[in-house]
Structure formats: structure tokens, C-alpha cells
Amino acid sequence: MVVKVGINGFGRIGRIVLRNAIEHGDLEVVAVNDPFIDLDYMVYMFKYDSTHGRFKGSVEVKDGKLYINNKAIAVFGEKDPANIKWGEAGAEYVVESTGVFTTTEKAGVHLKGGAKKVVISAPSADAPMFVCGVNLDAYKPEYQIVSNASCTTNCLAPLAKVIHDNFTIIEGLMTTVHATTATQKTVDGPSHKDWRGGRGAAANIIPSSTGAAKAVGKVIPSLNGKLTGMSFRVPTSDVSVVDLVCRIEKGASYEEIKNVIKKASESPELKGILGYTEDAVVSTDFIGSTESSIFDAQAGIALNANFVKLVSWYDNEYGYSRRVCDLISYIAGVDAKAQ
């Protein structure tokens, strides 16, 4: 079953979701909306990427449409999502990747244009949140607007689930060492809500807040209130790493914990989502990785049998975008069975 998809917002995530959809095979992107990028510029932005390299395929403009690998994609330039003709383009599932329409009410406007479901590629204040490998079984066909959570929650939640299921997390603190994102400044500039966030991205390690750890409690209810965290923004273009420090109820050696994570990474539930490596890796080794979370066995450390630091890498662009595709594929399958 090929699922027909529309993308609203052709920024970092929008473009990389499109790349992943082409690789994924189960999804066909039939429409893209972005009021700030004209068609010729879309071709350029999709073809060339400073982080992920040139697109290995054909990209061209023909008859007012974007053609990728000789397949036509309708292009819209609407500022108001209510005016996007998703239905006419055949897009049933819409990826909301502008970062602007992240509530049920705002993202729900896409339904007016003929979309059946909307997947928000960001955390949402009120939409049901799903993390592949963690809580997809909680999805119900009546949900019209869902959130794919954040890239950091997608990295942390599968790891936390494995640890909690096997050793019971009493409490934990997470730090994500996070690559630069589009909202940051190239040089110092105004950022009234977050003064540190206004400092030059290339010149600084910038402490920042993140709701990613608390959000794990939304997808794993038994961890609600047991995790929180913060972020350091660092001057790299892509790939981030989660550092989870937690107290566990059931004591275990670091070797035992490693073995449990390795076994989980090979299970049908988490294969392709949770990775495992014992290599002496660094961040660029994970550019283009499609897993949500790659556990670094050599980097972690245990103080004793109940207090442990666990380290897991993620391509915050590519891995996250692959999960957006996986989530759409999953919910479309559930929806089809429910009809």
C-alpha cells in the first residue's frame, strides 16, 4: 500500500522527510507547500545539501510542478494552511513541518483542504504524541492530528524504555549535546525569550532548555515525573548525543546493562530504531543514520550497580525524518484496517 503524503514547510525536516520518503518506498509525496520558496529554488535546495550531500537522483521543474526521479509533485505557496488544496493533489496524510502549527487546532486547519490526517514533526502541547518502538500501540484511528515528538525524545525514549522495562528507573537526568539548528544565530543577535540562544552558534557552547526528557513521561506513563533534562547547543551542523544519568532499582553491572540493550536492539520491536555500537565513534560517523538512537557501549559508565550514565547518538535530522515516515506508514496501515 503506497500512502500519499503532503509536506507543509520545505525547511530542514521537510526536505529530509522527502528524501526519506523516496528511500522508504511505502510513501509517495504528491504535494509540497511553502510560501517562502519558489519552485526553482526548491529544486536547488533539494538537490544540494551541505550536511547530507547531493541528492542522488533527478530533480527538475516541469509544467509548474516539482519532478523528482520523474515523479510529479504539486507545489503550493499558501501562507494559510486552510487554503492548501491537499485533496486535489491526492495527499491524504500531511506532514506539518513548519514548526509553527504545532497544536491540534492550528494543525487541524489542514483538514479543510482535504487532508485526512496530520503528523506534526515537533512536540505538541495537546496532540497525542507517538514514538516509534515505544508507544505506537496507543494510536487510535479516530486521531486526526498526531505528533512525532522531538528528535531528542525519539532518541531517549527507546533507551529509557529498555532500561525501565529491565531495571526500573527510579529517577534520571538527561543532557543532550545538540547540533546547531535553524533557529540559532550565526553571530550574536536579539533573542528576547532566550538570551543565551541569541549568541553566535559557531562561537559558543550554549546551555538551553528542552522538554524532551519530560516528554518521555507522555509516551511511557510509568516514567512520568521521573525524568527531566537540559541541552547544550554546540557548533556542529548535525548529529546530537543523549547522556542519560539514572538511578535504577534493580542493580546490575554495566556489562549486564550493555547486553540487555544489545539484545533489545536486535529485537523485532526495536530493530532499526535502537542501534548498538562498541566502536570508538564520533558524531560525524552518524550523519545519515536512520536509527532513532544508537547506544554507545564504550562511552557509558557506572558508579555502582544502581547509578549509571548511558550515552546514545542520533542524527537529529535524518533519523528523526525517517521516523516521521515510519509513523505515517504505521498509522495509515491501522487506518486501512479500521475501514
UniProtKB/Swiss-Prot annotation:
SMART domains: Gp_dh_N (SM00846). GO terms for cellular component: cytosol. The keyword NAD applies. Pathway: Carbohydrate degradation; glycolysis; pyruvate from D-glyceraldehyde 3-phosphate: step 1/5. NAD(+) binds at R12, I13, D34, K79, N316. Its EC number is 1.2.1.12. One of its GO terms (biological process) is glycolytic process. It comes from the Eukaryota. The active site is at C151. GO terms for molecular function: glyceraldehyde-3-phosphate dehydrogenase (NAD+) (phosphorylating) activity; NAD binding; NADP binding. It is found in: Cytoplasm. D-glyceraldehyde 3-phosphate binds at S150, C151, T152, T181, T210, G211, R233. It catalyses: D-glyceraldehyde 3-phosphate + phosphate + NAD(+) = (2R)-3-phospho-glyceroyl phosphate + NADH + H(+). It holds the Pfam family Gp_dh_C. The record marks H178 as: Activates thiol group during catalysis. Its main location: cytoplasm. InterPro entries: GlycerAld/Erythrose_P_DH, GlycerAld_3-P_DH_AS, GlycerAld_3-P_DH_cat, GlycerAld_3-P_DH_NAD(P)-bd, Glyceraldehyde-3-P_DH_1, NAD(P)-bd_dom_sf. NCBIfam families: GAPDH-I. Homotetramer. Belongs to the glyceraldehyde-3-phosphate dehydrogenase family. This is Glyceraldehyde-3-phosphate dehydrogenase.
